[in-house]
Amino acid sequence: MKKKANEEKAPKRAKQEAKTEATQENKAKESNKENKNNKAKEGKIKEAKTKESKVKETAKEPIPVKKLSFNEALEELFANSLSDCVSYESIIQISAKVPTLAQIKKIKELCQKYQKKLVSSSEYAKKLNAIDKIKNTEEKQKVLDEELEDGYDFLKEKDFLEWSRSDSPVRMYLREMGDIKLLSKDEEIELSKQIRLGEDIILDAICSVPYLIDFIYAYKDALINRERRVKELFRSFDDDDENSVSDPKKDDDSEEDEENEERKKVVSEKDKKRVEKVQESFKALDKAKKEWLKALEAPIDEKEDELVRSLTLAYKRQTLKDRLYDLEPTSKLINELVKTMETTLKSGDGFEKELKRLEYKLPLFNDTLIANHKKILANITNMTKEDIIAQVPEATMVSVYMDLKKLFLTKEASEEGFDLAPNKLKEILEQIKRGKLISDRAKNKMAKSNLRLVVSIAKRFTSRGLPFLDLIQEGNIGLMKAVDKFEHEKGFKFSTYATWWIKQAISRAIADQARTIRIPIHMIDTINRINKVMRKHIQETGKEPDLEVVAEEVGLSLDKVKNVIKVTKEPISLETPVGNDDDGKFGDFVEDKNIVSSIDHIMREDLKAQIESVLDQLNEREKAVIRMRFGLLDDESDRTLEEIGKELNVTRERVRQIESSAIKKLRSPQYGRILRNYLRI
């Protein structure tokens, strides 16, 4: 019996053991799967973290560049020189000081090794100019050859016809923009170097003429006194504070007055800092100029090595150029310098042409005007604007004479100041123009290659009050600022740097131009804060919050919040159509409170009729006195007793007596009852 019982229990135990083994195996498999999943997740997280860290490293840390020693950098300079010469200034840029005797020995060895000649920066620029002219002629010839080959290409003509079918300027702009290739990072660096090269050539030319340094230094007082805007002439000074802070308006609200006073204090502090910065920069420029002139005018020591002297002068000149580079003169200032130099070169026929061009604007059609014109020209440099106004017959001629005065003054000052031969001056002018051409070409190429970036950013700002083309143009302005301020040495891509400038330019344009009535920038910041709080409450509660809650969260008074919300309301045009008919306009339904209503008009006419009927009870003289005394004539003006007496040829006392007798008659109850009803209305 026991054996049978054990035999019966055996398969049951086996089944239970098999079940337990199966469950253990399943658990083991599940745990293995979980471990694998966890490991995979950890691996992904680690990969993501490593990617993020790599991105952060690439975004934050600049690309490490191996710094070359003086000898290595010098070797590279001589080896990579485009022409058969090397400038003194390029050597100074490597050493950042006057080279030692050992370094000068190395320079001489490299000159012999590479068969290079040491020259000044102006001579080096002249060499590069000659090379550039050859390249330009070759490029022009290539373009002409391509045009001749494509002259009979009918397929391209067909493509042009299809392209020209689109009338939308946005489509045309986007289509043309799509043909421009994007730049690689190496190409961006190369273009940045080209921009710097062009600016170096310009500054080299300016530094070679002391008068041009004085010409730039003369802007110091104009900048401090705000006669000229700083950012028009120099990029290094941030002059955007003038635009960002608007003139505070007068308001009865004491809180707004306090804010305006605080804003004025902030503006005055910024003005002080700006003036200090301008003074420091120009002081450093003046100091560098004096040191350079001192080295230039120092007596020549026959025992001193000529190369040492040349490198010393180059070092002083490079210091002056660095101080000038700190100011970052704009294209507008460089154009003014070019115009000054061109005016100096316009001696003889050139100057006469400019003079005749301005004289053509004057109406000199008789001998008297011609004689007066010659008299003014004889002493125009000593005349003020008031003197010119006193001598010319028409106000329109004053501006022309002021231009003539500027022409004569510029010619006199430049002839005295430049103290250079015309050929030398012409070389410097060509050097400035060439540097500007190199810089402008590189800037244009960099800007054109990033137009797609502007469009992609401008798309995010649509439906904000400005047309899409306007957004693109404002973004392009920001792009050009980014091109001016980009520094490739920091290791960032240009698109990363330019994005902020483009967004800033577009958002500022929307704030300034999107609304019919302009709102100051500081008010827009407050509006955005209030809108953010209101959106947050709507998302959380599903309804608009009370203004008290908004005021508390924003940190403003309730009245201030109400005023800000009033400001945000867009004005409605009087030409807005109303109703289904096209003829109905909103302006037709607006009440004109200056016009008398029809009921008031009827009441007034009825009152006039009743007054006339009452006055008919008086004699002619009494009627005339009452009408003139109480303004019942057509002009509705009250006259004094003296004025009435003069018109009626009676004394003042007699007029008073007539008036009192007439009023006595009108006080009768039968007349007063009629007019009393009008007083109640």
UniProtKB/Swiss-Prot annotation:
InterPro entries attached here?
RNA_pol_sigma-70_dom (IPR014284), RNA_pol_sigma70 (IPR000943), RNA_pol_sigma70_r1_2 (IPR009042), RNA_pol_sigma70_r2 (IPR007627), RNA_pol_sigma70_r3 (IPR007624), RNA_pol_sigma70_r4 (IPR007630), RNA_pol_sigma_r2 (IPR013325), RNA_pol_sigma_r3/r4-like (IPR013324)
SUPFAM superfamilies given in the database record:
Sigma2 domain of RNA polymerase sigma factors, Sigma3 and sigma4 domains of RNA polymerase sigma factors
Record-given protein name: RNA polymerase sigma factor RpoD
Residue ranges with Basic and acidic residues bias: 261-270
Q: Which Pfam families match?
A: Sigma70_r1_2, Sigma70_r2, Sigma70_r3, Sigma70_r4
Tell me which family the UniProt entry assigns to this protein.
Belongs to the sigma-70 factor family. RpoD/SigA subfamily.
Family matches, as NCBIfam families: PRK05658.1, RpoD_Cterm, sigma70-ECF
Q: Where is this region: Sigma-70 factor domain-4?
A: 614-668
Q: What is its main location?
A: cytoplasm
What does UniProt give as GO cellular component? cytoplasm
State the span of motif (Interaction with polymerase core subunit RpoC).
470-473
* Its job: Sigma factors are initiation factors that promote the attachment of RNA polymerase to specific initiation sites and are then released. This sigma factor is the primary sigma factor during exponential growth.
Write down the PANTHER family for this protein, in alphabetical order: RNA POLYMERASE SIGMA FACTOR RPO, RNA POLYMERASE SIGMA FACTOR RPOD
What is the source species? Helicobacter pylori (strain J99 / ATCC 700824)
Q: Which residues bind DNA?
A: 641-660
Describe the subunit structure.
Answer: Interacts transiently with the RNA polymerase catalytic core.
Q: What keywords were assigned to this record?
A: Cytoplasm, DNA-binding, Sigma factor, Transcription, Transcription regulation
Q: Which residues form a coiled coil?
A: none
